[in-house]
């Protein structure tokens, strides 16, 4: 069933016309099918022509026979849940009416059950005024739908009720049972849930009597079928718990939200006003959890081990305990982990019912402790737990925002105490069930509570006020599926929801103070739930997370530290651009290159972060970067790798058997360990097709792989290739650091020598010089440049100009994927490699001579900046999710220096230098040229 409560009456009428048309078509189709046996004698042909095969296949696949028209028709009867204001107005209106209407004052049916008492429609007599009170929306629609619904039911293929088969009165209960229920004054709408709650407690007989008296009148409002015998309302799944009418009267004057200090003399727990606004698809999931929590005592006692397992599963998915001022709790049943405390009522949390949670539910402890059960590391609490006696109550409901000390007292992993007093005796059955299994539960919970860490040690950066806004990601995923999500999914959702800090290459900064801070911190950011919450907190001024680049609060002149600028000019991998260099992440039209502002910004060349990207990045991304660039980071290359290669003629495959590595460099200097993996290429195939990788072996310098990497390739082609094996460290943010490589020339390899098929140790080496590629295979680019000085005299700020780059077309681009090519051009003004400064053209496919005719504009240029900057134009072949580098240009003065520091990207050729000089000398004039594309080689760091 779908949620159509938002539709207006006009829209509902339009849909009803469509449904009526559908019913008419069904009648015509049924008439045609009825006459088919007279014309068609073959059973198989008759089955195909009548459409019977389709309904049988659908029933086998979906296990039901519900039709789309029925789903829409029933969904339109769904009633929008009332909010607090509407419900209070309805109470006042009903109080002025007859006693019959006042009986229903607290029987607020959920939208999933709306209209149940009026089924079946085709047998319903004209509704009485009292029945319209139960569901005014559905009775208004029934008049226009009655004839349509009668004719829409196919006699040959009866359709089941979309709610549930148990809702039809004739499915499971005999007529005798219905009459007995009518005599007793109890309808099926409430009987199931009442029996589930009161089956084990004799003290609840008074409550049952009150409910029976209350429900005698609603029974009379149910219209009987035309045959004359009384009917019982269909029995829904036991999802909600109905309370006594006295509760709402008492709570009308109480503060909202409900206080935790409800006394034991309270007659009943009020129903939560704000219900879960979910579609009916989540109704089944709530029903499942309802059955888990409120099964009969005898069944639960016999399955003690099952209870233990269920609570263990819940423990990994429970969030922090809801705050006192939240309207409704989370959906989970919470038990106390303390052995000297019996678990309180599991049916009520904060005096509300199971299955509800507030629309305004807030993750109040966003900066507090997370569930330590989700982590792989054990954090021991050096101090005795402060939660052995439960959390203190909040005695005031007038202050919606708790104090800082109250915020810093969440329940930790494994202990979920229920501290509020039981507000009713209605749920003693559940408490009895919990008590009998408390030994097993408490043992499990106590062992789990040892994993928790003192929250006082974690909340050093807690903000003074916690958020009142609901956590959409956690709430939505609670609404969704029938099963609780796994701990892995919870970690992924939290890590995706929080703001991910930027991470740079390890030890890239020359600032020794930052390195000292790095060494004093834990590393496993993702695997620790404690660090998950720390990522949401404001960072401590005395420490920083390893690998997270910190920016000084005061602007730092980038020229005061030439050594830093040298390091920035060193080759670093393109994973600072998310490694894939996807086109979707680039800025297509922004072109603000404010050099004067850039030189004074904290995110200048002195700050190497993944967002600013102020490094000498090559234009080769991802896989190609590992082939055509220098060393990544400043990790020492050492150790060796053991592998063997063989060509299997029968399979026409090259097999690379990677055995192990030893004595690798430690990417984590403090713990002296790395997370290495091996990556292989067949050069010069630089794309994804030529790359193979092993699994990542965690926390070792001597990894053992024993994996075979296979290449499907002809032997003659293989003899023209080179095999490149490189070892990489993969950190927790999935960024790579180079640990060494080995390269074999397969052209001179002796494939017949058996010694070459044996495992051998090869020492790891630094990156070799990139493979030279023929310039004539790169193609050419036709472009024009123009420098426009800013003609705005009289401004206080120095005037700045613009550089216009007109990319016209490319000629004779190489084909790396056979006959397929989908090229585009990307432009960057070095030394700024941030995403905001990058622009690109559209992709032109199916041609080696693409015409772009795209102009890119960069502003903020002063005359002196023209001698220090360089325009980098790169051509890419876009294929699925990857971009393959084709060639590029670097247009500048080619001095090898930028702002007084030697850099490797200032390597323009004579033709490129000539074009740049003409542009500078001839402002406001387009300077055209056709330049050959080249492989942008990355030089080593300058000393």
Swiss-Prot record:
UniProt GO cellular component terms: exocytic vesicle; plasma membrane
Keyword Nucleus belongs to the record: no
BP-aspect Gene Ontology terms: exocytosis; intracellular protein transport
SUPFAM superfamilies xrefs: C2 domain (Calcium/lipid-binding domain, CaLB)
Region span, Disordered: 77-99, 118-291, 361-613
Keywords: Cell membrane, Exocytosis, Membrane, Repeat
Biased amino acid composition, Polar residues: 174-192, 382-394, 404-416, 426-440, 549-560
InterPro entries: C2_dom, C2_domain_sf, FYVE_2, Rab_BD, SYTL1-5_C2B
Gene3D superfamilies xref list: 6.10.250.3000, C2 domain
Gene Ontology molecular function terms on file: neurexin family protein binding; small GTPase binding
Location relative to the cell: Cell membrane
Ranges of Basic and acidic residues composition bias in the record: 82-99, 194-205, 524-537
Predominant cellular place of this UniProt entry's protein: membrane
UniProt superkingdom: Eukaryota
Keyword Cell membrane part of the UniProt annotation: yes
Listed Pfam families: C2, FYVE_2
Low complexity composition-biased segments: 125-138, 603-613
Domain RabBD: 1-57
C2 domain ranges (all copies): 637-762, 777-906
Known partners and oligomeric status: Monomer. Binds NRXN1. Binds RAB27A that has been activated by GTP-binding via its N-terminus. Interacts with RAB27B.
Recorded domain comment: The RabBD domain mediates interaction with RAB27A.
Function per UniProt: May act as a RAB27A effector protein and play a role in cytotoxic granule exocytosis in lymphocytes.
Protein name: Synaptotagmin-like protein 2
Organism: Bos taurus
Lineage of the species this protein comes from: Eukaryota, Metazoa, Chordata, Craniata, Vertebrata
């Amino acid at each position: 069933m779908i949620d159509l409560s938002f539709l207006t009456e006009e829209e509902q009428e339009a849909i009803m016309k469509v449904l009526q048309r559908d019913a008419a078509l069904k009648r015509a189709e049924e008439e045609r099918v009825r006459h088919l046996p007279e014309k068609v004698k073959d059973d198989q042909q008759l089955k195909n022509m009548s459409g019977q095969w389709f309904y049988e296949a659908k029933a086998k696949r979906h296990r039901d026979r519900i039709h789309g028209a029925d789903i829409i028709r029933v969904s339109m009867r769904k009633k929008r849940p009332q909010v607090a204001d509407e419900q209070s107005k309805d109470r006042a209106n009903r109080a002025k009416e007859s006693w019959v209407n006042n009986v229903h004052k607290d029987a607020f049916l959920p939208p999933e059950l709306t209209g149940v008492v009026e089924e079946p429609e085709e047998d319903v007599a004209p509704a009485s005024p009292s029945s319209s009170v139960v569901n005014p929306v559905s009775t208004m629609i029934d008049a226009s739908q009655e004839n349509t619904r009668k004719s829409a039911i196919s006699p040959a293929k009866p359709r089941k009720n979309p709610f549930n088969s148990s809702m039809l009165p004739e499915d499971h209960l005999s007529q005798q049972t219905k009459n007995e229920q009518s005599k007793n004054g109890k309808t099926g709408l409430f009987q199931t849930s009442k029996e589930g709650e009161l089956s084990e407690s004799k003290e609840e007989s008074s409550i049952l009597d009150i409910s029976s008296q209350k429900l005698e009148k609603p029974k009379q409002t149910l219209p009987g079928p035309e045959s004359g015998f009384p009917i019982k309302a269909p029995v829904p799944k036991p999802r909600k718990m109905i309370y006594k009418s006295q509760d709402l009267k008492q709570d009308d004057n109480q503060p909202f939200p409900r206080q935790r200090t409800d006394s034991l003399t309270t007659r009943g727990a009020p129903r939560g006003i704000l219900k879960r606004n979910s579609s009916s698809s989540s109704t089944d999931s709530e029903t499942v959890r309802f059955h888990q929590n409120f099964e009969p005592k005898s069944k639960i006692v016999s399955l003690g081990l099952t209870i233990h397992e269920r609570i263990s599963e819940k423990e990994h998915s429970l969030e922090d305990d809801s705050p006192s001022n939240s309207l409704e709790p989370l959906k989970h049943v919470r038990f106390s982990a303390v052995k000297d405390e019996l678990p309180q009522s599991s049916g009520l949390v904060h005096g509300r019912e199971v299955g509800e949670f507030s629309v305004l539910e807030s993750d109040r402890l966003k900066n507090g402790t997370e569930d330590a059960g989700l982590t792989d590391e054990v954090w021991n609490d050096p101090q005795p737990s402060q939660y052995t006696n439960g959390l203190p109550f909040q005695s005031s409901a007038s202050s919606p925002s708790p104090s800082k000390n109250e915020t810093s007292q969440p329940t930790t992993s494994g202990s979920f105490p229920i501290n509020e007093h039981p507000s009713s005796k209605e749920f003693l059955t559940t408490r009895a069930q919990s008590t009998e299994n408390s030994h097993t539960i408490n043992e499990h919970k106590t062992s789990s509570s040892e994993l928790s860490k003192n929250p006082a040690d974690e909340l050093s950066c807690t903000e003074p006020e916690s958020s009142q806004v609901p956590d959409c990601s956690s709430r939505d995923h609670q609404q969704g599926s029938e099963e609780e999500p796994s701990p892995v999914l919870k970690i992924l959702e939290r890590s995706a929801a929080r703001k991910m800090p930027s991470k740079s290459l390890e030890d890239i900064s020359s600032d020794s103070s930052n390195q000292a801070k790095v060494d004093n911190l834990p590393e496993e950011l993702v695997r620790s739930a404690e660090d998950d919450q720390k990522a949401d907190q404001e960072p401590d001024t005395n420490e920083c997370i390893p690998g997270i680049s910190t920016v000084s609060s005061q602007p730092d002149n980038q020229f005061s530290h030439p050594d830093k600028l040298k390091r920035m000019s060193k080759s670093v991998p393109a994973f600072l651009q998310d490694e894939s260099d996807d086109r979707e992440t680039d800025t297509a039209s922004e072109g603000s290159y404010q050099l004067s502002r850039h030189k004074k910004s904290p995110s200048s060349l002195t700050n190497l972060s993944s967002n600013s990207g102020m490094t000498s990045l090559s234009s080769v991304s991802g896989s190609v970067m590992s082939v055509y660039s220098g060393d990544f980071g400043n990790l020492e290359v050492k150790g060796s790798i053991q592998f063997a290669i063989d060509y299997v003629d029968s399979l026409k495959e090259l097999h690379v058997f990677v055995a192990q590595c030893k004595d690798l460099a430690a990417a984590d200097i403090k713990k002296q360990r790395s997370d290495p993996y091996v990556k292989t290429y067949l050069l010069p195939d630089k794309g994804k097709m030529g790359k193979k990788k092993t699994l990542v072996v965690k926390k070792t310098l001597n990894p053992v792989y024993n994996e075979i990497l296979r290449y499907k390739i002809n032997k003659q082609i293989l003899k023209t290739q080179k095999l490149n094996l490189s070892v990489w460290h993969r950190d927790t943010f999935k960024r790579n650091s180079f640990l060494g490589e080995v390269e074999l020339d397969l052209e001179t390899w002796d494939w017949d020598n058996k010694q070459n098929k044996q495992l051998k140790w090869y020492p790891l080496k630094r990156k070799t010089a990139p493979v030279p590629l023929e310039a004539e295979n790169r193609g050419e680019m036709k472009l024009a440049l123009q420098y426009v000085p800013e003609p705005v005299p009289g401004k206080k700020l120095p005037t700045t100009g613009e550089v216009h780059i007109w990319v016209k077309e490319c000629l004779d681009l190489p084909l790396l994927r056979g006959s397929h090519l989908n090229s585009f051009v990307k432009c960057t003004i070095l030394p700024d490699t941030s995403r905001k400064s990058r622009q690109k053209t559209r992709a032109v496919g199916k041609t080696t001579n693409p015409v772009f005719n795209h102009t890119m504009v960069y502003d903020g240029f002063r005359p002196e900046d023209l001698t220090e900057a360089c325009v980098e134009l790169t051509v890419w072949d876009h294929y699925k999710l990857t971009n393959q580098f084709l060639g590029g240009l670097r247009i500048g003065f080619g001095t090898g220096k930028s702002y007084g520091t030697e850099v490797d990207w200032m390597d323009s050729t004579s033709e490129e230098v000539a074009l740049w000089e003409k542009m500078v000398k001839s402002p406001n004039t387009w300077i055209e040229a056709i330049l050959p594309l080249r492989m942008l080689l990355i030089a080593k760091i300058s000393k």
